[in-house]
């Protein structure tokens, strides 16, 4: 007689408790981009599906955008910064080797004393971060009075964009 396997979905003890986001305020449409490059709105839409994109201004630093998103997630979860045991930031656009973006965010959200590190793995970085966060919670690497991990995916590609080059604009 077959025996039914009983499994849980996900790992016990690890779950998403808050979500936050930040998008730059400036909305740029294809017509504005096309004024700088040899292209058309139709060409861009057909090949990429892009109609608008967000460009960060000088006040919208990578640290500010990541910290704002983290603050919103903490607020939604009802968690304070001093309860955060680790901050993981997935990014490829942080232009400084040190301090890490995660260390800067840790300070901004009031989580000083917790672990902090960046993950540089392009598009997969955030997924790796979520997996590592779940492992940290389940293994007890974070816990006690700091049981939470904040995972952030943040990019500021405006700094790396050549606005006159069709392949990056």
Regions found by a protein language model. Give the residues of each.
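Acyl-thioester C-C bond-transforming condensing/cleaving domain
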Residues: 2-8, 75-81, 95-169
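Cofactor-binding loop segments of dinucleotide-utilizing enzymes, especially the Rossmann-like FAD-
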Residues: 19-21, 92, 154
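Conserved "HGTGT" condensation-loop signature of ketosynthase/thiolase-family condensing enzymes
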Residues: 1-85, 109
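Short glycine-rich or small-residue beta-strand-to-loop segments that form or flank ligand, phosphate
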Residues: 85-92
